[in-house]
From Swiss-Prot:
GO molecular function: histone deacetylase activity; hydrolase activity; metal ion binding
Active-site residues, record numbering mapped to chain: H118
UniProt-listed CDD domains: HDAC_classII_APAH
UniProt keyword annotations, A-Z: Hydrolase, Metal-binding, Zinc
Name of the protein this chain belongs to: Probable deacetylase MTH_1194
Pfam families hit by this protein: Hist_deacetyl (PF00850)
Length: 331
């Protein structure tokens, strides 16, 4: 069990903002109070050339200058401190190192911030500076021999940045389960956003109704994930690990709890594939700590017997997905 973390992540911090250094401190406290014994590894910064694998040079240069002038607000909810450019490079470097460790040890977890899955090719947004998981994926493809990565994003918000970066790529399978984008930021992640060009069919969104809980999440993922794994045949799994779908989280209206995070960790473990998880959202400190422990136990192979899954109000969503992806996967 390998966790990538640096105390320097705390230098990107705004105490009046929900995305603050207390998030990772809550997770570290939960680990310390548990019986888990991970090996902690401190990362180095991603090189500028690494960042440019998924971001434009103009955008990267702008962020460096912006932070150098003292930082501030990139938009209405995304901040930078004077240290944020370096810390964001460190967070991306942590995700890259996590990919390397997963290929050696089976699974790893980049416990870094700022998060990344909303960052697009040329824009930082949604608390995200650089797209950490996309950088790690490109590092794995170009340098580590990975050819068919699958991305599972269970953050409650659609990972519009990751989706857009790989939208035309047939060799990266992106799956996101998130709250209905008609009711939540960033307003993307509809069923008909399936990829384009050669990437058509390799971008799969599962928009969940407000109030969905463990039973609905387990049912629809249990119907979809095995079929996608069989059809796509990935050689590595990358997880955008957001915990803001928890019922206690203040930013959304999905109602899962630790049982879901236990199950999804255990499901990934059962695939036998190397897995890198990268921290995304989760804004209730207590729930964030408990959910991370549950997820890590599952990834580490602790068997989990889920509660009875049931379609509830999501059977129509599954029907639409089945029709839309019938040419690609046998749901």
């Amino acid at each position: 069990m390998v966790i990538i973390h640096s105390p320097s992540y705390d230098l990107h911090n705004h105490e009046g903002h929900v995305e603050n250094s207390g998030r990772t401190r809550a997770i570290l406290r939960a680990i310390e109070s548990s019986d888990l014994s991970p090996r902690f590894v401190e990362p180095g910064m991603a090189g500028i050339d690494d960042i440019l694998m998924v971001h434009s040079s103009t955008h990267v240069e702008y962020l460096e200058v912006f932070a150098g002038r003292g930082g501030g607000w990139l938009d209405y909810d995304t901040y930078m401190t004077p240290e944020s450019f370096s810390v964001a490079r460190l967070s991306a470097g942590g995700a890259m190192l996590a990919a390397e460790e997963a290929l050696r040890d089976g699974w790893s977890y980049s416990l870094g911030r700022p998060p990344g899955h909303h960052a697009t090719y040329d824009r930082s947004m949604g608390f995200c500076i650089f797209n950490n998981i996309a950088i790690a994926i490109e590092h794995a493809r170009r340098n580590l021999g990975v050819s068919r990565p699958l991305v599972l994003d269970f953050d409650v918000h659609h990972g519009n940045g990751t989706s857009s970066i790989f939208y035309r790529d047939r060799d990266v399978m992106y799956i996101s389960i998130h709250q209905d984008p008609r009711t939540l930021f960033p307003g993307t992640g509809f069923i008909d956003e399936t990829g384009s060009g050669e990437g058509e069919g390799f971008n799969l969104n599962i928009p969940m109704p407000r109030g969905s809980g463990n039973r609905e999440y387990l049912w629809i993922l249990g119907m979809i994930l095995p079929a996608v794994l069989e059809g796509f045949r990935p050689d590595m799994i990358f997880v955008s690990a957001g915990f803001d779908a928890h019922r206690r989280d203040p930013l959304a209206e999905i109602m899962v709890d630790e049982e879901f995070f236990s199950w999804i960790g255990w499901f990934i473990h059962q695939t036998g594939l190397p897995c890198t998880a990268v921290l995304e959202g989760g804004y209730d400190p207590e729930a964030l700590g408990r959910s991370n422990i549950a997820f890590m136990r599952g990834l580490d192979g602790e068997e989990y017997e889920p509660e009875t899954a049931a379609p509830g109000g999501v059977s129509e969503i599954f029907s639409q997905l089945s029709d839309r992806f019938s040419a690609y996967f046998n749901f």
